[in-house]
């Protein structure tokens, strides 16, 4: 119901919502901006100001002064978004990636911690006193949100995941390199190895069954062609968006319909 949608998003009464729908009362700029943000469409395109040869992307990370806190805030926004789209039975989420996705490793505490340690080390950000993997302690809230994100991603009705053969190779190469630099102990390597095997068993199970533990559908594919980055899209009955991965945990996002169609087509071709 459009009126109910406006009432919920704009916090207005039913009669006020119907007056806006009938054109009797114009939307304020603030109301229009709020609708754009919630429904993921471009206000520039609505009013005809958008240049047809330019696209707008939003970078997930802009500040690195408090990286773990920033990452936790982004996780909370992602959880809220996935919770919203998971309520739509038509929602489709797809990823083509050359690295193991958070949709799987996020529920494994040590794998998740190693991914964040690698990211902090590569960008030379975070606490300079944290010199080794063992010294990195993740806040309990961040660990909880990582697992919560996995839960809500797997709550989407249909998921497509496409990997190339470098997924595990990237993790093994990083483990080997950090071990040689004495940034991680042999015992931690064994713990991470065990979690990698557990995750592989989980992936094999869902691949055979074609569904997560909650019964939602998942289709896993292996690409014979190397994937140069990570690409994903989400589509529901109301909106759509894409994400292009960069800098390990960062990404460029846009709800642009042309880019959505391009990324969706590209991902679909990788599953052939």
Label each PLM-derived region with a short phrase.
Residues 117-272:
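Hydrophobic protein-protein interaction segments
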